[in-house]
Amino acid sequence: MNCGIPYCGFGKNIEGMTVGCPLHNLCPEFNDALCKNQPELTLKRLLKTNPFPEFTSRVCPALCEKACVEGLNFKPVTTKDNEYEIIEYAFEQGLIKAKKDIGKNGKKVVVVGSGPAGLA
C-alpha cells in the first residue's frame, strides 16, 4: 500500500470532529495484510484494537476513509468494506468461534449506551 503517512487510524478529535478511526483500528496494517493474502495476520491486526468488528463493521461511519491519504489523488481504500469481509471470512473459515455463555456469577452490571463502548 502507498499510504505515506496514514491518518486513517489516527482517531484524533480536532475542533470537535474526529479524524480517522475513533477505535484506533490498525487500518494500514490489516489492509496491507489483506492485500498480501494473509488472513490470520489480517484478523489478528483487526482484533488487536477492536473486540467487536462483526458489529462495528456494520455501523461504522467510515471516518478512516475520509482521512485516507490515497483519497487525495484516487479513491480512498475501502477500509469499512474490508473490515466487514475480514470478519465474515473469519467466521466462515472457523478462524473465530462464538464464545460460550459463562453463566451467572452473582454480580450485576449496568450498561450505559448501545455503542461499542457499551458492548465492551
Q: What residues fall within each predicted segment?
A:
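Ferredoxin-type iron-sulfur electron-transfer modules and their immediate structural context
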Residues: 1-108
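Glycine-rich Rossmann-fold phosphate-binding loop(s) that bind the pyrophosphate
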Residues: 112-117
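Short alpha-helical segment within the catalytic ATP-binding CA
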Residues: 120
